[in-house]
């Protein structure tokens, strides 16, 4: 019989030890080992292999398949019934401003601190829809403001018509007077040498009176239109509304809005001069045709 190797001996020794432990002698062996030491006083030691195991979970404690809630296939929380939310909100009046602020809140979050582009956009939208952003205006106040705006528009058109009639009457009388005083010679000549001659005194006084009337009429026009009611209404034209809506999308456009409004006011004065000048050209054309 061949000799066992060291590895086989250790294996047999381990199997014998496990067999003894399985027979319930683990506690005796442990006490025997501990009794040989001088530091251990107690011999009532029980091995963990001889301790009976207590069942931590019984069959009754296990949840049945019927009572166990199914595990969701995703990690999202369960969504509550939307009908309960609708029942809670059905008696509440909808706040359009709050809803728009919530919608615009996400876009305003990444515009940087201190940026109120969402609030400006909301205010411009409210103004474009002719609503009060504070939400405190009643139907009677809105109707009154609408009627007042219409009255100011009518009054502004009435003043423009008055200036138009006064200008035409004054310029017509000025032209007729100098035409008769010049011996019916106040007309345009088709010949270059005639136009190159010295200006007649009647022609000079005619144009002096024309320019004087223009300066007086345009100054009076600006003075009347500078009233607050007309000044505020002049900002409600189509160009100003387009710029107001564009500034809500592109805030840089808002800085040019006062300049455009001022340019429109100056254009009204320039249009008065151009219109009166075209009227004089028409009169000179008639006299030239009749003179020939």
From Swiss-Prot:
Xref: Pfam families: GET2
Bilayer topology term: Multi-pass membrane protein
Entry keyword set: Endoplasmic reticulum, ER-Golgi transport, Golgi apparatus, Membrane, Transmembrane, Transmembrane helix, Transport
Annotated compartments: Endoplasmic reticulum membrane; Golgi apparatus membrane
Residue spans, topological domain Cytoplasmic: 1-158, 226-268
Main location: endoplasmic reticulum
Family annotation (InterPro entries): GET2, Get2/sif1
HAMAP family documented for this protein: Get2
GO terms of biological process kind: protein insertion into ER membrane; retrograde vesicle-mediated transport, Golgi to endoplasmic reticulum
PANTHER family, per database record: GOLGI TO ER TRAFFIC PROTEIN 2 (PTHR28263:SF1)
Lumenal compartment spans: 180-205, 290-292
Region (Disordered): 1-80
TM helices/strands, residue ranges: 159-179, 206-225, 269-289
Domain of life: Eukaryota
Name by which UniProt lists this protein: Golgi to ER traffic protein 2
Family affiliation: Belongs to the GET2 family.
Ranges annotated as biased composition (Basic and acidic residues): 1-18
Residue ranges with Polar residues bias: 29-47, 55-71
Subunit annotation: Component of the Golgi to ER traffic (GET) complex, which is composed of GET1, GET2 and GET3. Within the complex, GET1 and GET2 form a heterotetramer which is stabilized by phosphatidylinositol binding and which binds to the GET3 homodimer.
Gene Ontology cellular component annotations, sorted alphabetically: endoplasmic reticulum membrane; GET complex; Golgi membrane
Function field: Required for the post-translational delivery of tail-anchored (TA) proteins to the endoplasmic reticulum. Together with GET1, acts as a membrane receptor for soluble GET3, which recognizes and selectively binds the transmembrane domain of TA proteins in the cytosol. The GET complex cooperates with the HDEL receptor ERD2 to mediate the ATP-dependent retrieval of resident ER proteins that contain a C-terminal H-D-E-L retention signal from the Golgi to the ER.
């Amino acid at each position: 019989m061949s000799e066992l190797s060291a590895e086989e001996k250790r294996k047999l020794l381990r199997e014998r030890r496990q067999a003894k432990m399985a027979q319930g002698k683990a506690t005796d062996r442990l006490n025997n080992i501990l009794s040989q030491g001088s530091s251990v006083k107690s011999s009532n030691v029980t091995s963990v292999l001889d301790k009976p195991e207590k069942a931590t979970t019984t069959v009754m404690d296990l949840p049945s398949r019927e009572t166990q809630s199914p595990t969701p296939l995703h990690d999202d929380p369960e969504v509550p019934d939307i009908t309960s939310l609708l029942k809670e909100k059905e008696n509440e009046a909808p706040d359009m401003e709050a809803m728009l602020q919530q919608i615009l809140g996400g876009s305003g979050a990444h515009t940087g601190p201190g940026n109120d582009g969402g609030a400006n956009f909301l205010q411009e939208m409210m103004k474009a829809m002719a609503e009060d952003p504070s939400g405190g205006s009643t139907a009677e106040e809105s109707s009154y403001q609408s009627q007042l705006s219409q009255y100011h528009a009518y009054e502004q058109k009435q003043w423009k018509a008055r200036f138009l009639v006064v200008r035409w009457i004054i310029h017509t009388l000025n032209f007729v007077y100098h035409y008769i005083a010049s011996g019916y010679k106040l007309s345009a000549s088709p010949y270059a040498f005639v136009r190159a001659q010295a200006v007649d005194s009647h022609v000079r006084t005619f144009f002096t009176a024309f320019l004087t009337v223009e300066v007086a009429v345009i100054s009076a026009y600006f003075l009347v239109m500078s009233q607050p009611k007309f000044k505020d209404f002049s900002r409600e034209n189509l160009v100003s509304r387009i710029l107001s809506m564009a500034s809500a999308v592109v805030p840089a456009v808002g800085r040019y809005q006062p300049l455009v409004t001022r340019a429109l006011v100056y254009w009204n004065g320039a249009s008065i001069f151009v219109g009166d000048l075209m009227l004089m050209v028409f009169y000179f054309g008639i006299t030239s045709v009749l003179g020939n």
